[in-house]
Design a protein with these regions (language model features):
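C-terminal engagement/docking regions of AAA+ P-loop ATPases
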Residues: 2-13, 17, 24, 69, ...
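Pre-Walker A (pre-P-loop) alpha-helix and adjacent loop at the N terminus of AAA/AAA+ ATPase modules
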Residues: 16-59
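Conserved alpha-helical scaffold flanking the Walker A/P-loop in AAA+ ATPase domains
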Residues: 43-46, 99-119, 148
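Walker A/P-loop
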Residues: 45-85
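Loop/turn-to-beta-strand initiation segments
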Residues: 52-54, 78, 114-118, 132, ...
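Walker B catalytic acidic pair
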Residues: 58, 121-122, 133
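P-loop (Walker A) phosphate-binding loop of NTP-binding proteins
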Residues: 59, 93, 161
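Canonical AAA+ ATPase core
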Residues: 100-105, 126, 138-220, 225-235, ...
Length: 331
């Protein structure tokens, strides 16, 4: 029997509360391998609970790959890495039909997409045709090969990394694919203090390929994720908060710097992410501050600027800052 406890003034099942505590502890567990980047870790946890996908942008060498590997280890989930290159083919992602000479039959050989956490490394280094191979998997959680749909494991989350677009040899992601990422997270270069900590770890024997030796152990798993997802669905959304989300997204469409603003799908993503953040924070209701906290990661990749605005130095985050400062906040 599942009992209930009082947390922050409301009743939750002890199972859901244990799941929340485990997911909060996940940040510290990942921190055994990754120095800093707390916001990125939190964003990945939010995406897992929302069944959403994440795009991470950062220059090479800021631990994007290590972050995903550490998260998978701390959740006891399967993970596969695909290095996207200019010659990567769609079948290299989804799998293909092969001929078995022993049985004289054709069979399906699964591609690396059949996993829990798929790390699509440097996704913008491969042409759009191969980038789009992930589209069905991200939206439908299945892939179709030779006309037959094949279901992907649950949970299934794509965590794609990309270099900044000004880097040579990169291909901009198609708008349809960008819109299917729940969040876009940025991983900046570390501070001096963090960089000293990174070098100290390596000087004392840290091996990024051996996370167990670094002390990273599973603190949560599929059961905790399922309990947490169920609990998130009970978090209350006041009409005023929903209206605030809509007003923020509509305001992006009227900005003079924007060619294409946030769609209703983007508004839904912001609402869902804010709801999850509220639950992780120990509340059973969403506040406008929750919406503000998630607005940039949930919307920055859905704001397409006019060319002249980009030349003048405008940025999606700058547009969102203006929107957040001007749209009235419900009381």
């Amino acid at each position: 029997m599942t009992s209930t406890v009082r947390i922050g003034g409301f009743s939750v099942s002890d199972e859901a509360e244990r799941a929340r505590e485990a997911l909060v502890a996940l940040r510290a567990e990942v921190g055994k391998a990754v120095v800093g980047h707390d916001a990125a870790v939190t964003g990945l946890i939010v995406a897992l609970l929302c069944r959403g996908h994440v795009l991470i942008e950062g220059v090479p060498g800021v631990a994007k790959t290590l972050l995903v590997r550490a998260l998978a280890a701390a959740l006891d989930l399967g993970t596969t890495r695909i290095q996207f290159t200019p010659d990567l083919m769609p079948g290299d992602v989804t799998g293909s039909i092969v001929y078995d000479t022993h049985s004289a039959e054709f069979s399906f050989r699964q591609g690396p997409v059949f996993t829990n956490l798929l790390l699509a490394d440097e996704i913008n280094r491969t042409p759009p045709k191969t980038q789009s191979a992930l589209l069905e998997a991200m939206e439908e959680r299945q892939v179709s090969v030779d006309g037959r749909p094949r279901a992907l494991p649950d949970p299934f989350v794509v965590i794609a990394t990309q270099n900044p677009v000004e880097y040579e040899g990169t291909y901009p992601l198609p708008e349809a694919q960008l819109d299917r990422f729940l969040l876009k997270l940025t991983m900046p270069l570390p501070s001096r203090e963090e960089e000293v900590g990174i070098l100290h770890r390596h000087a004392t024997g840290f091996d990024p390929m051996n996370l167990a030796a670094a002390g990273v152990t599973p603190v949560a798993g599929p059961a905790e994720l399922a309990a947490a997802r169920a609990a998130v669905r009970t978090v209350a959304l006041a009409p005023e908060v929903i209206g605030y989300v809509v007003d923020l997204c509509r305001a992006t469409r009227h900005s003079p710097a924007v060619r294409l603003g946030v769609s209703p799908r983007g508004a839904t993503a912001l609402m869902t992410a804010a709801r999850t953040w509220a639950w992780l924070s120990g509340r059973d209701y969403v506040t406008p501050d929750d919406v503000k906290t998630l607005a940039r990661p949930a919307l920055r990749h859905r704001v397409e600027l006019r060319a002249e605005a980009e030349l003048e130095g405008a940025s999606p985050d700058g547009v969102l800052d203006t929107v957040l400062a001007t749209v009235p906040v419900p009381r």
